[in-house]
Amino acid sequence: MHKVLAIETSCDETSVSIVSNIGDTFRIHSNIIASQIEDHSKWGGVVPELAARKHLELLPFVLDKALEEAKIKIEEVDYIASTVAPGLVGCLRVGSITARSLCMLHSKPFLGIHHLEGHLSSILFSENYPKKSFLTLLVSGGHTELIKVDDSRGMQRLGKSFDDAAGEAFDKVGRLLGLSYPGGPAIEKIAKNGDPMKFNLPKCKISDKKGGFLKYDFSFSGLKTAVLRLVERINLTGKTVPIPDIAASFERVVAEVLVDRTIKCAQDHSLDTVVVVGGVAANNTLRKMMISEASKKSIKVHLAPLDLCTDNAAMIGAAALFRIKFKDHFSSLKLGVAGRLSIEQADNLYEETPPF
């Protein structure tokens, strides 16, 4: 059995987790998450400098609590991992420097983990997670991507968002409607009282330079603008803005776009399994629609556990365990952090000469 201490500080959650695996069974011993939502809500979004300072303040306490809850001493941990890319650079540095310092102090191997690979690995904690090739819809505040994962766990991005990620669009539309931050949960809550068919909002596409459209890619900026224009038109009439109806219509369109393009991509690449991960994967409308529409095409759907959809260290630990188990990968203690790094470049984090 391998035990990993994992740290996640890529954005506004300070998280430390102790995870382990025996064969193909992955277990969470502790997964402590300190959210900064209250600190950033008055600004309507994450303030990078504030987030980094809060990580510095919270991480020692979160680390102690994770070890205490797991009933383990740091000397008993086999490996230490942290998110190193992509994310907010100042925030990433807090977790990475802490992890590498602990490795040096306690003579432990270090693994720098790609944040998106962490999200993909959250599915390892679900029952009967897929062992063969599958398509992942990774949909969060910062990313909306379709990633093919092959039998050997090689990763290839097949689709992406060209502007706002789906989660970012939820936040911006939520702010536009006067809802609380973060926008995703706020929109989902109020949409329950609305009519999802009330407004016909656009499903934006990305033009292909060769002609037609990029059928696996996403654009949510136009949808956000359409909601803004709708609210402006209603305000000009002097009528009350039907916020529940707008929220429900927006939520429906986002879910339809994500589901339709995911299923199309899976069919075109002869993949019979779809995995949905990331913060927006917690949205109930998206979860139900994906299962319903995929079943019509004989496509199996695996959903990330609800408590592991948003950023957390357990998913980073799972990615580390998978690297150790199947690829025998470790990172140099000289490895730094990067604000941007594509998922196809994740293997570079384990090179003898670090990429950054």
Curated annotation (Swiss-Prot):
The keyword Acyltransferase applies. Fe cation binds at residues 115, 119, 311. SUPFAM superfamilies: Actin-like ATPase domain (SSF53067). One of its GO terms (cellular component) is cytoplasm. InterPro entries: ATPase_NBD, Gcp-like_dom, KAE1/TsaD, TsaD. Its main location: cytoplasm. Binds 1 Fe(2+) ion per subunit. It is an enzyme of class 2 (transferase). Substrate binds at residues 138-142, 171, 184, 283. It catalyses: L-threonylcarbamoyladenylate + adenosine(37) in tRNA = N(6)-L-threonylcarbamoyladenosine(37) in tRNA + AMP + H(+). GO terms for molecular function: iron ion binding; N(6)-L-threonylcarbamoyladenine synthase activity. Its cofactor is Fe(2+). It comes from the Bacteria. It holds the Pfam family TsaD. Its EC number is 2.3.1.234. NCBIfam families: gcp_kae1, T6A_TsaD_YgjD. Belongs to the KAE1 / TsaD family. Required for the formation of a threonylcarbamoyl group on adenosine at position 37 (t(6)A37) in tRNAs that read codons beginning with adenine. Is involved in the transfer of the threonylcarbamoyl moiety of threonylcarbamoyl-AMP (TC-AMP) to the N6 group of A37, together with TsaE and TsaB. TsaD likely plays a direct catalytic role in this reaction. PANTHER family: TRNA N6-ADENOSINE THREONYLCARBAMOYLTRANSFERASE, TRNA N6-ADENOSINE THREONYLCARBAMOYLTRANSFERASE, MITOCHONDRIAL. This is tRNA N6-adenosine threonylcarbamoyltransferase. It comes from Prochlorococcus marinus (strain AS9601).
